[in-house]
Amino acid sequence: DKSYSLLLKILKEEYHKKPSGSKIKNPLEYILQLTEALQIKEIDATIIVFFIKQQGMDLFNQQNVKGWDGGKSWLTSQLYLQRNNVSDLLCNGRNINRKTFKNLPENGEELKISLEKIDIRINFNPKGTNKQIIKELSDAYLFQIDENIQKDKEAILKYDFDASSKNSQQAVVRLFNFITKSPEFQLI
């Protein structure tokens, strides 16, 4: 009975620090979350493998028995920029391919290759107000929200937003794109 109570104590009280928000998404988690949220069905698995390899996660060539370094190595400034560019492409309904990664624009230049158009959608409450939809997406995809980011999101999805209008999907996708570019989206 003593060992049982000790084991119970260890399992219930072992670690007081909350682990959420302390880990950076690895490239696979990142791209799969994007494709799932945007409900992309026709993305080529080899493109996902190529993307995560470009991000430093070669699935079939781990650095050692332990696996990948993880942690902060998943998010250098170059990898963060590449993630933002991929998010832009997908949120604009453009499929990614190998040429995309070789020709990613720098410093706001236009992308010079033609990309296949894909259908994207974000699930949201069609009867919700702008603040309800912002909260819904923030709760689903962000670890924490600060006041400045909240104001920026409210500038994207304005107070007079009508969730039942025909352009509501594009507005919510713009909001999602903004969310994906925030540092908080990179955290688990």
Pin down the residues of each PLM region.
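Flexible, low-complexity segments enriched for small/polar residues
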Residues: 1-188
